[in-house]
From Swiss-Prot:
Homomultimeric. Residues 235-291 are annotated as: 2 X 7 AA repeats of G-G-G-L-G-[ST]-P. Its main location: secreted. Sequence repeats lie at residues 235-240, 286-291. It comes from the Bacteria. GO terms for biological process: monoatomic ion transmembrane transport; symbiont-mediated perturbation of host programmed cell death. InterPro entries: HrpN/Z (IPR006961), T3SS_HrpZ (IPR054634). The glycine-rich region is characteristic of harpins. Belongs to the harpin HrpZ family. This is Harpin HrpZ. It is found in: Secreted; Host cell membrane.
Length: 370
């Protein structure tokens, strides 16, 4: 249920930015569809203060950087609009939004109104039950993924550096990692939040962990982009999470992903861990039960009876086999629960990132005054 609530908050984030097709913020002459132009115009309104780009929000920073590289003015609405249009196509694809349609569900006014008839507050969202395209949600999730991709800058020997300007976003990622320490352990047992405060760089091992966390969060953003566009086959904007980045869930549930750094697995150690997990499962919930001591059973005088009262080799083999099976079942169940918790946590962080995408210092101050 928590995961569903997190996903719902991601889908409704776009409703914070209602879109009107009649917007005349600019006469953008790009090849974008009418619907995408309407989204861009609405985002420009949210990103500007008194006709000037607010560079204090995550998206504002990224757009300002792109505009500076192109020699564009942050004081021109036309330049801001054209640059945002270009940025969207660079990050989401050349043909993104080229044939976006208007949702048919909901009220009679605006774009895909949520049954209100006013066309305000629903953004570009269409009938959620039909899974039709929600262009605003696609844009926000795609740009949110792009912000994550730009957080780390490669440096020497596999390490990376980051900017203090991106600290609000970095701290959300670090908190996600601290909340899921089993998947993202630190070498010294400290916190990722403190790691960010030490300096503005990560070594190769820290970078690998951080990128793994970014991949998990990015996958949530990509999944939401795919859901908004009606794509249900996975993929989307999120980087596919490789087995090497998340590790083997059957092993990680007990040992953590660090164990996957060793290519040569100690089979004996693994079997021992599975047996130990099987014993824990049995002791907590019955199952195989306590090994039977033959000394408490009648021998019946048969040759097959074990006169020493010890468990026979055959019984011991069956017992170990049963423990291994129970250990594997319990480990896989734990891994499934861990994976669900991780994805739920990632969905929450993704929703926070989308909600903060346009939140700059200036409009936060204005909202507080209002």
């Amino acid at each position: 249920m928590q995961a569903l609530n997190s996903i719902s908050s991601l889908q409704t984030s776009a409703s914070l930015f209602p879109v009107s097709l009649n917007s005349d913020v600019s006469a953008n002459t790009s090849t974008s569809s009418k619907e995408l132009k309407a989204v861009i115009d609405q985002l420009v309104q949210a990103l500007t203060q008194s006709g000037q780009l607010d560079e204090t929000s995550p998206l504002g920073k990224m757009l300002a950087k792109a505009m500076a590289a192109d020699g564009k003015s942050a004081n021109s609405i036309d330049d801001i609009t054209a640059s945002l249009d270009k940025l969207i196509h660079e990050k989401l694809g050349d043909n993104f939004g080229a044939s976006a349609g208007i949702g048919a569900g909901g009220g009679g006014g605006g774009i895909g109104g949520a049954g209100s008839g006013s066309g305000v507050g629903g953004g570009l969202s269409s009938d959620a039950g039909a899974g039709q395209s929600d262009l605003m949600s696609q844009v926000l999730n795609g740009l949110g993924k792009a912000v994550l991709d730009d957080l780390l800058t490669p440096s020497g020997e596999g390490g990376t550096t980051f900017s203090s300007d991106d600290m609000p976003t970095l701290e959300k990622v670090a908190q996600f990692m601290d909340d899921n320490k089993a998947q993202f352990p630190t070498r010294d047992g400290g916190s990722w939040m403190n790691e960010l405060k030490e300096d503005n760089g990560l070594d190769a091992q820290e970078t690998a962990q951080f990128r793994s966390a970014l991949d998990v969060i990015g996958q949530q953003l990509g999944q939401q982009q795919g859901d908004a566009s009606g794509v249900t086959s996975g993929g989307g904007l999120g980087s596919p999470v490789s087995d090497s980045s998340l590790g083997n869930p059957a092993i990680d549930a007990n040992t953590g992903p660090a164990a996957n750094g060793n290519a040569s697995v100690d089979v004996g150690q693994l079997i021992g861990q599975l047996i130990d997990r099987g014993l824990q499962s049995v002791s907590s919930g019955g199952g195989l039960g306590t090994p039977v001591d033959n000394s408490t059973q009648p021998t019946g005088g048969t040759p097959a009876a074990n006169p020493t009262g010890n468990v026979s080799n055959q019984d011991l083999g069956q017992l170990l086999s049963g423990l291994l099976q129970r250990g594997l079942e319990a480990t896989l169940q734990d891994a499934g629960n861990t994976g669900a918790d991780l994805q739920s946590s990632a969905a929450q962080v993704a929703a926070q990132l989308i909600n903060a995408l346009l939140q700059g210092t200036n409009n936060q101050t204005n909202q507080a005054v209002a």
